[in-house]
Every structure is written in C-alpha cells, then in structure tokens.
Amino acid sequence: MTAVAVQHLYKSYNGEPAVKDVTFSVGPGEILGLIGPNGAGKSSTVKIILDFMKPDSGEVELFGQPMSEATKNQIGYLPEAKGLYKDLPAIDCILYLASLKGMDKATAKKRADELLEQTGMLDSKKKKIKHMSKGMGQMIQFIVTIIHDPELLIMDEPFAGLDPVNTELMKNMVGKLRDEGKAIILSTHQMNQVEELCDRVLMINKGEEVLYGDLKQIKSRFKKHSVQVSVDGEFGDLTGVTEKRVNKEGVELVLAEDTSPQSVLDQLRDQGIIINRFEITTPSLHTIFLHMAGGNHE
C-alpha cells in the first residue's frame, strides 16, 4: 500500500498560487527528496499532507485513506522550526511528546533510553533543552520524531546544526528506517544529502512540479549538459560552454542546451590541447537544481 498519494494539489494565498497541480506518491521502504528554492511551495505541500491546512482542490491519502486521528499516530514529523520545551530536561520532553502519540510511559521510557544510547545522548538526558547545543537539540528532536515507530516520516532539514559525526550517525539511522520499510519524505537544501539518501526526487519551483522520478534516471537525463576534462596546459574560450568548474579531477564544463560534447572536443583539438581525459559526466544534483531553478523546465 502506498504511504502517501497526492493528487493534483492546488493552493493559493490571496489569489497568488503557491501549489499548482502537484501529484506524487511515496511508498514503504523509500526516501523521497523534496527539493526546490525558497518559496517554491514545498512547505505548503507538506502542511497539506499533514492536514495543517486544506488545499483549494486535490486529494491526499495516507495509507489508502484520508487523514484521521489514527493515521496521525503513524506519522513522525520533524519540522525545521523546532518545537521542544526548552525548560524541560530532555528525557521529560521526549516522554511528554511521546505521550501525545499514544505511548504509555513505560514503553516510551524504554524506547527513549534505547534511542538516546544510539545517538550518544544518554548521558545528557537530564540536561535541559535550553542548555543544549543546536546539534544536541536536533538529535532530541529526531528522537521525538521516531520514538513511536511511525510508518511515515516527514523531515524538514533534519541535518541542520549537526557536526559531521552526528550527520553521519543520523544518515545511517534514516537509512536503517528506510530498510525497515518506513516511507520517508526528506525536505532539504543540502543536495549532497539527497544524492546519498534518496531513491526518488520531487522538485517544486514556483508551485509547480518540475522534476519527479528516480534519482538515477533524472541524473541520466542531464548527462549531455556536462563534460569532465583533464588537459595539459590551459585552453581558451569554448563556444557553447556556459561555465567552467575547476575540481580535483580537472575541469567540469557545463554546456549550453544546443551544444554537443563532440563540438567541445573538436574545439579543444583545434586549439592543439593535449587531452588526458574527456568524459561525458552525470552532473551533480546541485547542478541540476540550479539549472531547473533558473527557469528551464524541459
């Protein structure tokens, strides 16, 4: 059964469209990356899924049915704006929020201690939230999100404030949840995290769906737009090259829509350049994001 099925969502504010005909689904055991520029309509889409607000038209089904009180307890939501009680010790905050998801105290306490230990936070469980670093608070928020073993996770910038060690720890835990069959929506501006974690991607720009599908297939579609070259010496201007990006492997050349890799190779040869490597590359999701956010939706 599909965990989330969104059909033809529309939402406007004061006559200005924020979400325009967005359709997608998320199944068990997969992570969908929800990406787009600021103000693209991602937050509105998430709020509609969570029933925080109603769409002007369109439908959302969770586990094959409309949102209900029973369905809400199958969802774990990690918002970008944190909702922890700052004057409470971490463990008290976790247990209180777990109770709102229907967990009894004994079960919640056992589960909380397990998660605190997994995240390296067990020794800090009696520390008040207000005395914790941003990264520690983020880990507590993550624990609150998953403590009731939800079937659907919706996470907005989950890695914000985390150091590299805790980022890797959380990524591993999220990957394990996916392997356990959880459906996960990951909304973030960190394209490298999307590439590492997500199976599929939905990009919204100006309220519209501009990219949707398997991440590998999406990257393959953009393969012709970039080549990686390594040469001896320096080369001059190349017609049809819109950007040069120096990296540890040489130079990545971003090509205009109507420019073929062969024409660039011919130009380099015409300049008498010794070419050690010329490879049609699959551009990073970051590059694709910039390309699509710039208004080209082909």
Regions found by a protein language model. Name each.
Residues 2-4, 11-205, 211:
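ABC transporter nucleotide-binding domains
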Residues 13, 174, 222, 292-293:
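Hydrophobic aliphatic residues
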Residues 70, 218, 288, 292:
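Residues that scaffold the ATP/ADP-binding catalytic core of kinase and kinase-like folds
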Residues 172-255:
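ABC transporter nucleotide-binding domain
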